[in-house]
Amino acid sequence: MNKFLYITDQDEYSDHSFIGPLFQKYLTKHFDINTTFFSKEKSEIEIKEDGRIIIPEKSKSHILQELEKNNINLNEYQFVVVRNNTDLLKEVLKQKTKYNFKVGFRLSFPKRIAKLETDLANNKKSILDIISNKIQTYSEVNLINECDIFLPTSFQMKNDYFKDVKVRTFVIPSAIDPDILHDNIQHEGKEKRFFYAGTLDKLREFETVLEAFSTIDNDKYKLMISTKDPEYLDDMLSLYPNLRTNIEICDAKNREDLLKLIALCDVGLSILPDIALFNSSTPIKVLDYYSSAVPCIMSKNENNTS
């Protein structure tokens, strides 16, 4: 069986629910797979029985060298795929000929572009940022073109941000593992419960959603919000005092807590501005809603209707 190394950009304790099922369950029928994660706490590599390899954060810049030091034979891998991080991709490509493996690049979400768009929304984007973005994009395209395959979340993501990539492209959208679906729990209240999970900032324009709810002239609904941006949420809610009694702020500590809250709701919310960043991939919150059998109101765009 061919060996496959998947180098992620994620911490060992972050949510891997959309990496794990594909690379640690379904593809293991066809490949012997190792998946790497990083740790800020650990000082030495840990190799788990399930194929995970935990690498100290300090070794990030020389990951292949660190793997070899720990008796992991890189010559045994036929395929190496890097997730999101082009610095890691650059190191892997330098060793491609030496170890004779094929290289892929997985783009789950364009994080650098997201930061640029957020800076634009906050009036922090300068001409230097625009020039730097063009240079970085050119460099990234060249790196991806050295790969054997490009694995974006959607063709729209490729066309919007990496249209000059010429290598073979195979789309891998985020998905739900059918083995870990959650039951939808009917709540006892008569009100309709709406749920929003995720980031709140100026770029996402959540005040548009609040504005819509503020026009409802009855109290037969509840808007539940779980976010890691509570201060930003408080600032927004201060502009809509008539919503206070209809809003419940939730503090989900982890994904399991979040899914339990979602399962008690009637409708999920994922209404986002009509910009390329949000139109090119399905937000994780949508998959969280669907995995608990909760329907979702989302933006109308080509990606969401496909």
Per-range role (PLM):
Residues 90, 105-115, 126-150:
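Membrane-proximal helix-turn-helix segments that form the acceptor-binding/catalytic region
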Residues 40-42, 197, 222-236, 251:
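Glycosyltransferase donor-sugar binding loop
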Residues 1-44, 75, 211-217, 301:
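N-terminal subdomain of nucleotide-sugar transferases
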Residues 12-14, 201-204, 256-261, 268-290, ...:
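Nucleotide-sugar-dependent
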Residues 234-267:
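Nucleotide-activated donor-binding/catalytic signature segment of Leloir-type glycosyltransferases, i.e.
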Residues 156, 175:
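Carbohydrate-associated surface elements
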Residues 79, 96-121:
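Active-site proximal beta-strand in glycosyltransferases
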